[in-house]
A protein has these predicted regions:
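ATP/nucleoside-binding phosphotransfer catalytic cores, i.e., glycine-rich phosphate-binding loops
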Residues: 2-28, 39, 235-243, 259-345
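Short helix/loop capping segments that flank catalytic or ligand/cofactor-binding pockets
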Residues: 48-49, 179-180, 258-260, 322-323
Length: 345
């Protein structure tokens, strides 16, 4: 379901809104009954190698294997009608984004418990949930009964001119982040995934920013107007470079990241932003230290902003990336979505 980077022409929407059927089916189940498990399996995910799921592996699990993103809303609606207690997502970050987006109209603010089997090229959510790379379906089902529960709220991103086109995901980036994602696709082709891909693209981006002029795409960034909720106050600018541009923006509700990076410093809970102005070459050299929490003091004066927010609106002149896929330039509202329980070992 998650493919090469491209802009959504249109988003698939569930024809069933609300979750009354799912709630009713779940309420009918006797106390102590075996949980009903649904599985979304994406054969296109990197580590699934294009193979269909062997149904003998999970005879007691309701399996949905949508061949295309457009089929996902109906697949989720059928699982909801069965009153599932646990929804297992077999795929990477892009598959998780698609499930959350397409399931928004079905489950609303009351989702079943989720589990993620990290099978994609990037699996940042699984890193945050401390999920083993080889986590199995049976292990996820066992964790529903005996494992830990971790609560996370995905970000909800809404185009201000298309409020019905809300999407949900965990990592949003713009400016140099967009270029870095494209470079990451090249790193994937070379066989670098997850933490290694993060290292490769970070190194390449620093080289570009270090030796390029402010006209270099890695240093130029994108025009961004960032307004913080609830009062619409503009995010401060250090005055370095063009005050209408930001070299990079990253927003997320995750708390732990691949390769141990800490882009938000000591901030952990809720929605967080890291925004970089067109910083000096000296500050560019310090970026690796900043990412690992050992950067210089006075980061804001040096053009690097780390903050928590209840939400924000952004207008930008270039596409942004949400969990590996590009969305068009425009004006958007970004805020925390529903709180969802995930199982972990």
């Amino acid at each position: 379901m998650a493919g090469p980077i491209h802009e959504f022409a249109q988003l698939p929407r569930a024809r069933h809104t609300g979750n009354s059927v799912w709630r009713a089916r779940r309420a009918e189940r006797p106390e102590g009954a075996t949980p009903t498990v649904g599985l979304i399996y994406n054969p296109r995910s990197h580590r699934n190698k294009g193979q269909d799921l062997d149904s003998r592996i999970c005879p007691d699990v309701i399996v949905a294997q949508p061949g295309h993103r457009d089929q996902l809303p109906e697949a989720l609606a059928r699982l909801a009608e069965r009153g599932i207690d646990l929804l297992v997502i077999n795929g990477g970050d892009g598959t998780v984004r698609d499930v959350l987006t397409c399931g928004d109209a079905i489950f609303g603010d009351d989702w079943p418990v989720l589990a993620v089997l990290p099978k994609g090229k990037t699996n940042a959510l699984a890193v945050d949930l401390d999920g083993p790379a080889e986590w199995t379906l049976q292990a996820a089902v066992d964790a529903f009964e005996y494992g830990r529960r971790i609560k996370r709220s995905p970000m909800a991103i809404t185009p201000l001119d298309q409020p019905e086109a809300r999407v949900m995901g965990f990592i949003l980036g713009a400016g140099a982040f967009t270029l870095g994602t494209k470079a990451g696709q090249s790193a994937h082709k070379l066989g670098a995934f997850n933490s290694l891909a993060v290292g490769v693209t970070t190194f390449w981006g620093i080289l570009q920013a270090l030796f390029g002029t402010r006209a270099n795409p890695w240093r130029r960034g994108a025009r961004m107007d960032i307004r913080l909720a609830p009062n619409g106050v503009a995010l401060e600018h250090s005055g370095l470079g063009d005050p209408a541009r930001r070299q990079l923006l990253l927003a997320s509700t995750l708390e732990r990241f691949p390769a141990g990076i800490r882009p938000f410093g000591t901030l952990r809970n809720g929605l967080k932003l890291a925004v970089m102005d067109q910083v000096s070459r000296m500050m560019t050299l310090a970026i690796p230290a900043v990412l690992f929490g050992r950067g210089p003091r006075n980061l804001r004066e040096r053009g690097f902003h780390q903050l928590a927010a209840t939400g924000f609106e952004i207008e930008l002149d270039d596409q942004f990336i949400l969990d590996g896929e590009a969305f068009p330039a425009g004006r958007y509202r970004v805020e925390p979505g529903p709180e969802i329980e995930f199982v972990a070992p």
